[in-house]
Amino acid sequence: MLVLVINSGSSSLKFQVRDVAAGTVLTEGLIEKIGMGNGGDGDGEIVGPRDHAEALEQVEAAIHEELGDLKLGAVGHRVVHGGERFGEPVLIDNEITRAIERLNPLAPLHNPANVLGIRAITRKWPDMPQVAVFDTAFHRTLPEHAWRYAVPDELYTNHGIRRYGFHGTSHEYVARRAAALLDLPVEEFDAVIAHLGNGASITAIQGGHSVDTSMGFTPLEGLVMGTRSGDLDPSILVFLGRAGWTPEDLDSMLNRESGLKGLAGNNDMRSVVEASEDGDAKAAMALAVTSYRLAKYIGGYHVAVGGAKALVFTAGIGENSHQFRALVADRLGALGVEVDAGLNAARSKEPRIISTPQSAIPVLVVPTDEERAIAEATAAVAGSGR
């Protein structure tokens, strides 16, 4: 089956066509500045469309130019928030679309854009099977003691305030790949997976299932990220509010001006590492804060799974920054973690072990592929009609 994978943002639309049976990418692209003028960077230059419907026309033209008359079998959508209802990928109909739309308050930056993509496909190809694959779904297995916040119960019952977790599609895919690399059935796979990109999260895996994760009600909680603060004392927000900061000010500061950017003035890990190596004290401190926070989570999640059988790094920083992996590993001596410097520094796009034979647990680097995971889930759901 040929599957079109759509990742729809408020002003962008990333697409990829995959042959699921062959495991290959046939074409892909990115349309940007939707509703904002001209722009685009895909297989060819694309003029910025007025809206998502026009963007889809350009996607269709780009696909036809590359693939001719090959027919798509289904469309898979990345949907950021599935709330408590959606614990697995689902075939989209009007009721499902409305249900996703009702979750907009939980992900106001993402779900409305996801719905725009769904509606554009529905108008363009009304008979095309569409499947929603949710970032939150993999974390539906969190036990209540992991997803509950210690706040009055009415905040959960009336407002849905709880830990949801994100990056679930990536964490699930990487868990399966890592288990296979270690020749373990996924049902016996207990591990800690660190998805480290501009957005970053860490997940405790027990028996192949998520039992804890660092992102919470929103993707702001947890690790130090590119521009997001991660964990901090909530009273800081009360303090700043009394000092005149508006909710919009606080939201912008925490999501767009904090993290590596707040500490080092730059949200790009490569640049921060280079600056640190050149003697920049702020960059060095940013790396220390970021690696320390991650190491603390790794230690806690080692306990949460009853003793991890592996530590796995994935996503842009996790896959490519051997310097940052080394910084984190250096903080994990109490767990018996030992990384081989040569294996760690070697570049590869393949899943691999980078720890020494003496390491108490294997340390892995496993490239993620969320589009592949979405395509495979879409083919399975569309094929079964569920």
Swiss-Prot record:
Pathway: Metabolic intermediate biosynthesis; acetyl-CoA biosynthesis; acetyl-CoA from acetate: step 1/2. ATP binds at residues 14, 195-199, 268-270, 316-320. One of its GO terms (molecular function) is acetate kinase activity. Pfam families: Acetate_kinase. Transmembrane segments: none annotated. Its cofactor is Mg(2+); Mn(2+). Its EC number is 2.7.2.1. GO terms for cellular component: cytoplasm. PROSITE patterns: ACETATE_KINASE_1, ACETATE_KINASE_2. Mg(2+). Can also accept Mn(2+). The record marks 167, 228 as: Transition state stabilizer. It is found in: Cytoplasm. Homodimer. This is Acetate kinase. It comes from Pseudarthrobacter chlorophenolicus (strain ATCC 700700 / DSM 12829 / CIP 107037 / JCM 12360 / KCTC 9906 / NCIMB 13794 / A6) (Arthrobacter chlorophenolicus).
